[in-house]
Amino acid sequence: MRSVITGVAGVGKTTVLDIVSKETGIKIVNYGTLMFDLAKKRGLVENRDQMRKLSRDIQIDLQKNAATEIGRMEDVIVDTHMSIKTPFGYLPGLPEWVLREINASAFIIIEADPELILRRRQNDPTRARDEDSVESIREHQEINRAFAAAYSIFSGATVKIITNEEGKPDKAAHDIIKVIAVD
């Protein structure tokens, strides 16, 4: 079983996934962290901020290698992004070469009310985020749904939307456990 779980920043994904992992014992692998670890081993970077400055070809190579590693793992949840918002538009978080290697059985998107997400982002002093609005958060969540549908068409994996209601991360975690238990 390999499931991909995503959500926009501030949706509460880390909290929910911590509960899922504790209750199931399933390993959570952060795709970006795996890419960073590979780059660091090769001596390409010393910190995560340097990842953005690597050439496109090197980044694609790191993506492929991280995906290959994940593809060898059993019973794992991949924590990543369905789409990445840039000043130029949305980039796919799971390009074709990543989808093929990961071979996920399910794509799960954690969502929350955009107003709640905005409040969480505004109250998080540990992150330097771009200026956001309820509308831009709503748009990003809609884009994530569209990308998930496209990935599903390519891969044959199911798509499930899970709502993380305020103060109810346990409910969202249990909804996820029901989906991944089928695998």
Curated annotation (Swiss-Prot):
Where does this protein reside within or beyond the cell?
Cytoplasm
Answer whether the UniProt record assigns the keyword RNA-binding to this protein. Answer: no
Task: Establish whether keyword ATP-binding is in the entry.
Answer: yes
This enzyme catalyses: AMP + ATP = 2 ADP
Q: Which Pfam families match?
A: AAA_17 (PF13207)
GO CC aspect terms:
cytoplasm
Q: Keywords in alphabetical order, please.
A: ATP-binding, Cytoplasm, Kinase, Nucleotide-binding, Transferase
InterPro entries attached here? Answer: Adenylate_kinase_AdkA, P-loop_NTPase
Q: For this protein, what is the EC number?
A: 2.7.4.3
What is the protein's major site of localization?
cytoplasm
Q: What is an example of a GO molecular function annotated in this UniProt entry?
A: adenylate kinase activity
* Record-listed ATP binding positions: G7, V8, A9, G10, V11, G12, K13, T14, T15
> Record's superkingdom?
Archaea
Family according to the record: Belongs to the archaeal adenylate kinase family.
Query: What NCBIfam families has UniProt attached to this entry?
Result: PRK04040.1 (NF003122)
> What is the recorded name of this protein?
Adenylate kinase
**Species of origin:** Thermoplasma acidophilum (strain ATCC 25905 / DSM 1728 / JCM 9062 / NBRC 15155 / AMRC-C165)
